[in-house]
Amino acid sequence: MNDKCVVLNAKKMNFDGKLDFSVLSSDVTVYDDTTEQQLSERIQGADIIVTKEMPVSAEMIQKFPESVKLICEAGTGYNNIDLEAARKKGITVCNIPSYSTERVAHTAIMMILNLSSAMQVQMKMLACGNHDNFTRNLQVPHVEVNGKTLGVIGAGHIGRKVIQIAQALDMNILVYTRTPKEDEKGICYVSLEELLKNSDYVSMHCPLTESTKHMINKETLSLMKPSAFIINTSRGALIDEAALIEALENGMIAGAGLDVQETEPPEETNPLYTMDQVLLTPHMGWKGLETRQRLVSILADNIKQFMEGNPINVVSGLSYLAK
């Protein structure tokens, strides 16, 4: 079967030019970027469309040719695609739920360890020529993580990997999730309010939906300990950024580790850039070459299984049997 596959914005995942997309289909066309004006011409006759965090609106989907059977989001999050519009047009949408599990979990743990030692502050001090910490007591917070409580919001693949590593660090675990499991050793399932009140570190690992947008806001931030840190390696809009900045400025919480932001990249004037208690990274959790190669491999399997009538990783649409 010679199925036409179009990759609309490959540069988003292939920024170093090292990925091979030929495994997706014997007939694959790859574009670095695609504007909405270019879309119609580029997807004519396409069976499969691949995107990476590119907005795919209802208006765009309505204009898709009838040949389109599958939209593949080349990542875990799929809030960029109008799922209802795809469903109405009979188009299946799939994602890649676990390609970056290890790497993103490592990023979250790295942030916890970094913030516990104010590593970014100490590096800045040395870079500015302040060598006092070599000869006298530390002038920044420096705490152990063992025995501290980690609150994990969302217990999917990444959340559970974070829990596994945190348990190896002898951290206590609180979890808030829609799907708790019974009798899990060392894990205590609690309400969001209880988690925020009792955690020394809070790590976000849930998808961005209408119900989770700004779930961390002025009200929920006020529940946290003044000594607590919040970590977000999931989606920026889970946290009301303005409320977070206010909480940090007023000392309501101790700090934040953010690999994702509401607007990426943040505006140049965003206070998060210059806050000593913030560890800000450029959505790097998924960007390692090994991780991206795994992404393409799973993406190819998604397409293969779908076209053989056994769709996997479906987030919306019909259990479409390819003809």
Q: What name fits each language-model region?
A:
Residues P55-V68, S211-F229:
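Rossmann-fold NAD(P) dinucleotide-binding segment
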